[in-house]
Design a protein with these regions (language model features):
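Signature of lipid phosphatidyltransferase scaffolds
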Residues: 23-27, 32, 140-184
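Primarily the HKD phosphodiesterase
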Residues: 57-118
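Structural recognition of the beta-strand scaffold that forms the well-ordered cores
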Residues: 44, 69-72, 94-98, 120-121, ...
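A short, well-structured juxtamembrane/interface segment
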Residues: 52-56
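Solvent-exposed loop/turn segments at secondary-structure junctions
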Residues: 74-78, 99-103, 125-127, 139-140, ...
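N-terminal low-complexity, Pro/Thr/Ser-rich intrinsically disordered segments
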Residues: 21-50
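Bacterial N-terminal signal peptides
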Residues: 2-10
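Boundary at the C-terminal end of the N-terminal hydrophobic targeting segment
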Residues: 15-17
Length: 184
């Protein structure tokens, strides 16, 4: 749909006769990648901004059947927030976030906060800088990727999707500890 809208805008404006800018072409390419994004496979890596990592994360969130546990430092990407809020209607969603995210709320975080998702603030001396998502205690995503528009569209970021049970179990133990110690 975004690809179609972008093309219609190009054709309906007076600029259709001019050569589209590099930025317009990049946005069209990224939109088409997002449309074609499939849920991540086991042991898959995604590198932003060259790949549709935000769309891949949305697809990953949409695969949850029972529970999603998220530890995230920052969130400004509305599409990711919408996927979390939508998932929270049908599966248990728990989030541990950095205290700055709670203070500096924005539209994306507000969407999740208004949903049935349970959110707690990480308790630690410094910042809660983790970035990982656990799905159904069986699969996970981790890496440098924050839930931000910049992470998916301009920053050099990485995501790693895993289902190795021993690794997922370690992250689940870590999340459960963070959850118990976090502030409501």
């Amino acid at each position: 749909m975004p690809l179609l809208l972008a093309l219609l805008c190009l054709l309906s404006s007076n600029s259709w006769a001019r050569r589209p800018s590099k930025k317009i072409l990049e946005n069209i390419e990224r939109s088409s990648e997002a449309l074609l994004a499939s849920p991540p496979k086991d042991n898959e890596v995604c590198f932003a901004p060259d790949e549709a990592c935000s769309a891949k994360l949305v697809k990953f969130i949409q695969t949850a059947k029972h529970q999603i546990d998220i530890a995230i430092f920052e969130m400004t990407d509305r599409k990711i927030a919408e996927a979390i809020a939508e998932a929270a209607k049908t599966v248990k969603v728990r989030m541990v976030v950095n205290r700055k995210l709670v203070k500096d709320t924005g539209p994306a975080y507000d969407l999740v906060r208004a949903s049935p998702a349970e959110i707690r603030v990480g308790k630690q001396r410094g910042i809660m800088h983790d970035k990982f998502t656990l799905i159904d205690e069986k699969r996970m995503e981790t890496g440098s990727f924050n839930y931000t528009y910049a992470a998916g569209n301009s920053n050099q970021e990485n995501q790693l999707y895993l289902s190795t049970s021993s690794i997922v179990a370690r992250y689940q133990e870590r999340f459960d500890k963070m959850w118990r110690e976090a502030r409501h």
